[in-house]
């Protein structure tokens, strides 16, 4: 063991919720005096935070464990795949410990057993917002754990349990700390953001001399007081989602909804155990756009679900034409160990699934390209993520990190833009994924009808 601080390597896999779990473990490790190192060779022990949602994620997680075992030999496994300890130990019987998601205590106990901590705490070395794995200018804000739904294709409840919401004041205080630490964008995540607070009966809690309900709209009202971008992810399509559109129209919340519709056939949605009123869904999308013309709607879909007919797949393509969604992700259905959909009849052949997925994505690519083309000539507020060869790579209010498009600011180097800058960009070109443009220079605001334009270095 090192004569100085004990050293821990860390591998984080999976979704943004798992990333937050990793950040919490890393924060506790630093508080207790452990150094976090970037290589297996430098580590005294390695923690692997796994994903187990779909078969490809299981394979990736097992491969990561194997790589850590081969390179280091002392490995602690946690995360969603940890809910299947027998699968891990069958492949790698010499792992030191296995625990499930958000079981921070078990992870720390395993680290202590393998690598005793120093006795003096290092709290002063850890910022009050904790250790973050994202760039400094944005952060994921997890508001709850688990899910009360039982979608037939999903095993998340068996891994992460039923919904457990964090009290609203606790979430708002964490958001405050993040903003004090330089965060310009808060990405609200959970398994079901729109169910936030139902398990707490929407209990009221005080924050900044005001009472707030533990409810999605009230949380958004509180977050809007912090003066940074706030983006909602994983919103289940409940009717009360309509309540936050007004906040978007007022500029208090980013006009962006990540809302997984999954399919457009009422019969398939019923088999998925998802809401099935497609006509109402289309009406609501149109109503959101009427209330907030700038709104961006992102969604995800599954093609080739068991029993999906040619006609039902065509109805899904028709839905894309009618809904005109801005951003869409999709994947071909694959059985997930433990999911009830595995037992459904009429499984779709693999070649049909992949042919449908290709057609689906081609259809949406056409829609996305036209929607992005319509932004040429407009001015978009953007947040700079990276500087590459005198070009600033940024995201507009319509783009979440990792999953959406980018804005390539051609004169970013000329203007001396930096990562984390907020800047107004005049859009000059587009393709099916990204926008291209020039930042408007700082100095006196440039007036255009309906708005003031100005470079903001914040």
Swiss-Prot record:
Manner of cofactor binding, per the entry note: Binds 2 [4Fe-4S] clusters. One cluster is coordinated with 3 cysteines and an exchangeable S-adenosyl-L-methionine.
Q: Which InterPro entries match?
A: Elp3/MiaA/NifB-like_rSAM, Methylthiotransferase, Methylthiotransferase_CS, Methylthiotransferase_N, Methylthiotransferase_N_sf, NA-bd_OB-fold, Ribosomal_uS12_MeSTrfase_RimO, rSAM
Q: Where is the MTTase N-terminal domain?
A: 6-116
EC id? 2.8.4.4
Cite a single GO BP annotation: tRNA modification
Give GO terms: molecular function aspect only: 4 iron, 4 sulfur cluster binding; aspartic acid methylthiotransferase activity; metal ion binding; protein methylthiotransferase activity
- What GO cellular component term, any one, is given? cytosol
Please give the catalytic activity noted in the UniProt record.
Answer: L-aspartate(89)-[ribosomal protein uS12]-hydrogen + (sulfur carrier)-SH + AH2 + 2 S-adenosyl-L-methionine = 3-methylsulfanyl-L-aspartate(89)-[ribosomal protein uS12]-hydrogen + (sulfur carrier)-H + 5'-deoxyadenosine + L-methionine + A + S-adenosyl-L-homocysteine + 2 H(+)
UniProt xrefs under SMART domains: Elp3
The residues that the entry says bind [4Fe-4S] cluster 1 are 15, 51, 80
What keywords tag this UniProt record? 4Fe-4S, Cytoplasm, Iron, Iron-sulfur, Metal-binding, S-adenosyl-L-methionine, Transferase
Which compartment or compartments is the protein found in? Cytoplasm
Where is this protein chiefly located? Answer: cytoplasm
Q: Which residues form the Radical SAM core domain?
A: 133-371
Using the UniProt record, name the top-level EC class of this enzyme in a single word: transferase
Q: Which Gene3D superfamilies would you find in this protein's record?
A: Methylthiotransferase, N-terminal domain, Nucleic acid-binding proteins, tm_1862 like domain
Cofactor(s) needed, names only, are: [4Fe-4S] cluster
Protein function: Catalyzes the methylthiolation of an aspartic acid residue of ribosomal protein uS12.
Q: Which HAMAP family match?
A: MTTase_RimO (MF_01865)
User: What's this protein's family per the entry?
Assistant: Belongs to the methylthiotransferase family. RimO subfamily.
Tell me the NCBIfam families matching this sequence: 30S ribosomal protein S12 methylthiotransferase RimO, MiaB/RimO family radical SAM methylthiotransferase
Protein name stated in the entry: Ribosomal protein uS12 methylthiotransferase RimO
Q: Which organism is it from?
A: Xanthomonas euvesicatoria pv. vesicatoria (strain 85-10)
Organism taxonomic ancestry: Bacteria, Pseudomonadati, Pseudomonadota, Gammaproteobacteria, Lysobacterales
Q: What is the gene name?
A: rimO
